[in-house]
Amino acid sequence: MSKTKTRRWLKRTVGWAILLILVMATWVYVGRYGSTPAFVDANGRVIAGSVATMERLRLGGVEQSVVIRGRNGNAPIMIWLHGGPGQDETGLWRHYNSVLEDYFVVVYWVQRGTGRSYSDDIPVNTMRISQFVADLDQLIGVLKSRFGKRQVTIVGHSWGTSFGVAYTQAHPENLAAYVGVGQVVNAAEGEKRSYQFTLDEARRIRNAEAIQELERIGPPPYGMDKILRQRAWLNAFGGAWQRPTTMRELLWTSFKASEMTIYDGIKYMPGQNFSLNALAAENAKVDWLNAATRFQMPVFILAGRFDRNTDANLQHEYFEKIEAPSKQFRWFEKSAHSPPFEEPEAFNAYLIKEVLPVVMARQQNGG
């Protein structure tokens, strides 16, 4: 190859390499951080007073991801407390429940140890309910200051209700309302009922494989590995999702949201494994049935009729014991453990028609 051809080849190679680096850098940046769309009018102009941000907040010494969205920045604040632990539900909420952003300022918080809020540097001894309560309190402080509110509403799902109730007891003055979805009540009793349902169902339909594995696992208490095996059969029998749903389906739906990226995918399993194992022992001891029945704010318990993850009947038993300024219980007849995603239209309508007026009344009275 002549010197001239060599120089041309080098220039082309270097040029392509630089272009590839730029493309990769752009992809990594977008892939890591994602974006959340602005609220715009019919002419494409950003609606005055709306809010649509993605940010990182240092809560309890750990950087955590928060998406804040609302068509009206003066609307009541609602914070989602996702399940798991370690399960970022931002994409699912954005897909199924984004209409709530027209009525609330909705805060999608990715808790410490979950997804993009996961880091190898998080001390395992900070993965405690008390720390999640402290993180939430710090987040609420930021939101109250930024939006000029005295109170917010928290909506917990599954694990989110474990520390959600703990927060209601520690800082009732900050809450306009508490909403528990798939409420954790008494973890030990819930696990016992969940296991028995799964074994009974396996025997009813004569599923030999399920019977054999469940009998080998035996009744709780047991470790996380056995919980996950029991949950797999629970899902197959409609006790986790009324229509059995695969993790692939959930992830596919979740990652349609612009806020969710390849970075979230990379962080998903490490964060979930870390969170589940770190919190398993303490979460197994949760007993709000005996430890938290008095609330100083309105309480809403929303249960899927077929929920055998956090037993639906146990949720209703808990509701019956609750003392609060006002309380409501709602059955979702076509759901198991996740009414927001299994019956989104009914779930959204309930929050708008039943929860919002209560919250607005408290806000008008100084909340």
Write out the residue ranges for each language-model feature.
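Short beta-strand element of the alpha/beta-hydrolase
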Residues: A75-G84
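A catalytic-pocket lid/entrance helix-loop region that shapes and gates access to the active site
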Residues: A170-Y222
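Alpha/beta-hydrolase
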Residues: I205-N290, R294-M297
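Glycine-rich "HGGG/HGxG" loop immediately N-terminal to the catalytic nucleophile
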Residues: T90-G91, G113-M127
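Conserved acidic catalytic loop of the alpha/beta-hydrolase fold
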Residues: Q131-Q151
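Conserved alpha/beta-hydrolase
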Residues: E101-S119
